[in-house]
């Protein structure tokens, strides 16, 4: 009896194997995803926040930093250090309150927005310029300026990387900041 069960199971397995070998496999053509282009629209820079064009000019010509930031009404704080997090050579801020001072030269946090006006800061760190705003329309305006300046999206992600030649601009949506390198 056991012999018949073994023979029946072997015949069944062979039948399944032979049946599956004779089935034709269907091939599928690879699907080519269409490339989406970012829409570039002409945008008017906000008067309260430094424009991307002026920030690029400051990056190219560091001697123009004081004149450009004065034009927008930014105040200067040198050697701004967020305790155990960041250190900036220069921190220009507008409509912001500096965080609480923990030690002689270390602050508790980044600048905080005030209720009046569009709050922003421009920070200089390790050869990069960081522009941060505190509301979504101002951030969207900065990103639109980046696109209008001819930068193309190179790497999308949590921080969208735009490139133009050897210049790179990173737009961090969650932090509402733009970093020019």
What are these regions (language model features)?
Residues 1-10:
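Bacterial N-terminal signal peptides that target proteins for export
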Residues 92-159:
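Long, charged/polar, surface-exposed segments that mediate recognition or autoinhibition
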Residues 22-24:
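Bacterial signal peptide processing site
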Residues 38-39:
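Coil residues (strongly favoring Ser/Thr
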Residues 17-20:
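C-terminal motif of bacterial Sec signal peptides marking the signal peptidase cleavage site
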Residues 157-174, 179-180:
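Short, exposed beta-strand-loop hairpins at the edges of beta-sheets
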Residues 50-59, 127-135:
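Second-shell loop/turn segments in exported
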Residues 57-78, 135-155:
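Amphipathic alpha-helical segments
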């Amino acid at each position: 009896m056991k012999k018949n069960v073994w023979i029946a199971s072997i015949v069944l397995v062979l039948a399944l194997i032979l049946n599956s070998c004779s089935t034709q496999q269907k091939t599928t053509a690879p699907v080519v995803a269409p490339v989406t282009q970012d829409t570039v629209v002409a945008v008017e820079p906000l008067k309260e926040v430094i424009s991307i064009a002026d920030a690029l000019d400051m990056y190219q010509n560091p001697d123009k930093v004081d004149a450009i930031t004065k034009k927008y009404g930014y105040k200067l704080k040198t050697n701004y250090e967020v305790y155990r997090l960041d250190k900036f050579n220069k921190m220009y801020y507008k409509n912001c309150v500096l965080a609480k001072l923990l030690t002689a030269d270390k602050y508790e946090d980044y600048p905080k927005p005030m209720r009046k006006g569009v709050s922003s800061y421009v920070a200089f760190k390790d050869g990069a310029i960081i522009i941060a705003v505190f509301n979504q329309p101002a951030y969207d305006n900065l990103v639109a300026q980046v696109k209008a300046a001819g930068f193309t999206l190179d790497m999308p992600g949590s921080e969208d990387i735009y490139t133009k030649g050897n210049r790179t601009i990173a737009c961090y949506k969650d932090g509402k900041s733009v970093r020019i390198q």
